[in-house]
Regions:
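Select subsegments of transmembrane alpha-helices in polytopic membrane proteins
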Residues: 136-143, 342-352, 505-511
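Membrane-water interface at loop-to-transmembrane-helix junctions
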Residues: 124, 339-347, 399, 404
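Alpha-helical transmembrane segments
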Residues: 180-182, 319, 415-424, 519-523
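Hydrophobic transmembrane alpha-helices and their helix-loop junctions in integral membrane proteins
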Residues: 1-19, 24-341, 355, 361
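Aromatic-capped, Gly/Pro-kinked transmembrane alpha-helices
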Residues: 365-410, 421-526
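Alpha-helical transmembrane spans of integral membrane proteins, capturing the lipid-embedded, hydrophobic core
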Residues: 21, 52, 56, 224, ...
Length: 526
């Protein structure tokens, strides 16, 4: 809490960086809470190392701010923003990068690490190794939100750079769709929710890239509640299942855990963006803002986030049907002891279900189409897609009714229907579909091979390079030539000189005669 408050309330880049690093450190420690588990230690180390890559870019961005603006104070930097647009960094004699573009891209590298954007996203699913309440905290209110907040806070700089905004939009929209696809093939209930976080972070990032900063922040707020609800609901299920997390070994839990089921269902509808729930108001505003955005690549981003609605609904209700519906698939002992979790677990679910229902409608006017953020968020003149959509906004009630006519609503219905048919009506179909689309499933199950690339390409590659350098550099050059080579030269030279010291007097007399002859000859010749 202290770290996030420091990050949010800072008024200069130095304080921001301190809070930024403290959030990363605390998250690293929380992920490794079960320090006796090798998987937990590997996960927190992975999170720490991946974020170091992003934080290196973030630190370079802060250095660029100091170089171009001469200060780290927000107010002074933002006041100089129009002047920064006229400054450039010449990389070659013919190629220069505008200062706002360089600063924004470097700062966004940090956001890619903290907010788990492609390609620095791979640490987030592994953070599930921590306790479930820790997962809820990291995915809802701390680590992953830091990058989204930072980009929105730096909107005066990002808005000056079309290339940076295009990059942010492309990365976000790609993550919103393709990270959601991985969630469809996951069987661990917590990992499904983890990949939903990656997808929803993609929506927030895409909103920032489209210039809808308030929309991204609004979705961050609503997402915090229903994502915490889903994680804690998953924790309730895991406790009832005696710490089993494989959804294939669940089923039929709705009759045993009614409170968990109803609250989990509310979170599922909010995540899917069903009209009336909190997620609908924030997500549909983002989709609409991207539709009218002038950022290059907005057409691709619009279709990516729109199809992401279908993907989100499929993995969400696949989780619902596998966990709470159908025939019980757990062992007899677990089934005999199934019961609702105690009130200390269900009460937080009920409390989180309330904002997951009503927060979107209550906050839409102020957060999305109002002036809640004031001067904290800056757009290019005439380039705020939320304001363009505000002309069609006639109040929360009309926005709610409009939701039943949008393409996103029909995609939600289609996703629910698809999962109901595949997992309730015809539960044998998923196995058939898996065989038909096995190449696609194989790629998704291997998470687009990012982990393989990082482990075999970078980690193992670095080790092989290190071994090569050690063998030829340290062993061959330093030890072989410089250290042992010097000793070898001394040994060879001393052995030659040793033969000259024979101990016979006539050898020395002969050497003296030869020496005198050489000297006399040289004097005569000269």
């Amino acid at each position: 809490t202290f770290s996030m408050l420091l990050l949010v309330m800072s008024n200069n880049f130095l304080q921001l960086f301190i809070g930024w690093e403290m959030v990363g450190l605390v998250s690293y420690l929380l992920i490794g809470f079960w320090y006796t588990r090798e998987s937990a230690i590997t996960a927190n180390l992975k999170a720490f190392i991946v974020n170091r890559v992003g934080d290196f870019g973030f630190l370079l961005g802060i250095a660029a701010v100091l170089y171009f603006a001469g200060t780290l104070n927000y107010g002074q930097v933002f006041a100089q923003a129009p002047l920064l647009a006229q400054k450039h960094l010449w990389l070659t004699g013919h190629f220069a990068v505008a200062a706002p573009t360089l600063i924004s891209i470097l700062l966004f590298a940090g956001a890619m690490g903290k907010s788990a954007q492609i390609p620095l996203h791979s640490w987030l699913p592994d953070s599930m190794e921590g306790p479930t309440p820790i997962s809820a905290l990291i995915h809802a209110a701390t680590m992953v939100t830091a990058g989204i907040f930072m980009v929105a806070r730096m909107s005066p700089l990002f808005s000056l750079s079309v290339p940076a905004m295009t990059l942010v939009l492309f990365i976000g929209a790609t993550g919103a769709f393709f990270m959601g696809l991985i969630g469809i093939v996951q069987n661990d209930i917590k990992r499904v929710i983890a990949y939903s976080t990656l997808s929803q972070l993609g929506y927030m990032t895409a909103a920032l890239g489209a210039g809808a900063y308030a929309g991204g922040m609004f979705h961050l707020v609503t997402h915090a509640f229903f994502k915490s609800l889903l994680f804690l609901g998953a924790g309730s299920v895991i406790i009832a299942m005696h710490h089993e997390q494989d959804m294939r070994k669940m089923g039929g839990l709705a009759r045993y855990m009614p409170v968990t089921y109803v609250t989990f269902l509310i979170g599922a509808f909010a995540l899917s963006g069903f009209p009336g729930f909190a997620g609908y108001f924030s997500k549909d505003a983002i989709i609409d803002a991207i539709r009218v955005s002038t950022t290059p690549g907005a057409t691709y981003a619009y279709w990516a986030v729109l199809l992401g609605v279908l993907v989100t609904t499929i993995y969400t209700f696949r989780m619902i049907f596998l966990t709470f519906h159908g025939k019980p698939r757990m062992d007899a002992h677990t089934r005999e002891h199934l019961k609702e979790s105690p009130w200390v677990i269900t009460l937080p679910l009920v409390l989180l279900a309330i904002p997951s229902l009503v927060l979107g409608g209550l906050g839409l006017s102020a957060l999305d189409y109002g002036h809640f953020f004031g001067a904290s968020i800056v757009n290019r003149v005439g380039d705020n897609p939320l304001l363009q959509g505000a002309g069609e906004f006639h109040g929360t009630w009309q926005f709610f009714l409009h939701g039943f006519t949008t393409p996103a609503f029909f995609l939600v219905l289609s996703g629910i229907a698809i999962t109901w048919v595949c997992y309730i009506l015809r539960p044998d179909w998923p196995r058939v579909l898996r065989k038909w689309f096995y190449p696609v499933v194989y790629v998704l199950e291997h998470k687009y091979f990012f982990d393989d690339l990082y482990f075999r390409g970078f980690s193992m590659g670095a080790r092989r390079l290190g071994n090569l350098l050690w063998r030829f550099g340290d062993g061959g050059l330093i030890d072989g030539v410089m250290v042992n080579g010097s000793a070898r030269c001394v040994r060879v030279g001393s052995s030659v000189l040793r033969r000259l010291q024979s101990g016979y007097l006539y050898h020395y007399a002969f050497a003296m005669v030869i020496g005198i002859a050489v000297i006399v000859g040289w004097l005569v010749w000269r």
